[in-house]
Amino acid sequence: FNLKPFSFKHTGIFPEQATNWDWFGHLISEKVKKNPDKPVKVLNLFAYTGGATLAAAAAGAHVTHVDASKGIVAWAKENATSSGLIDKPIRWIVDDCVKFVQREIRRGNHYDGIIMDPPSYGRGPKGEIWKIEESVYPLIQLCAQLLSDDPLFFLINSYTTGLQPAVLSYMLSTELKAFDGQVDSQEVGLPVSSNGLVLPCGASGRWS
């Protein structure tokens, strides 16, 4: 992975997400083992530098990687090359995530797994405004329409205090109730070696 420190304290990877990568990676690999002739299709929205994309691809999924920043998608491709995964079936898309999902619905496309890692605030390539408290629930509603008849998982991450684990669980439980499955949510964090505590780094809501 290619790391680059930024003034806003990002380095290009969120290591606390490793537990989620292991979680959906296991689901994907088990599905591939059971039915190797049927691709597991995963949609990664707000995909950033590709940590989740590469974890899904390494597990055997066909991944659609969507981010509004052309430079960030180029960085994700560099990471795929550095990780030896550039030849995996990954579609690299520079687009506004909401508009991409709307088009995918019209095209009739479906996915077995969906990953969402939305920012608290952002702008699309054409100036589209994203505010997580206002925008994330309608996007979950749209994404539910993209799930296949036998979906595998849905993951949403939050780095804002306005979307706590219980809120994520509520949204997923409400919108995915048509599918049999279980919802859980949790805080994610990084272990601190000096004191044995865990540094909170956000929250995740998961359906499978």
Regions from the language model: what does each represent?
Residues 142, 147-153:
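Short glycine-dipeptide loop
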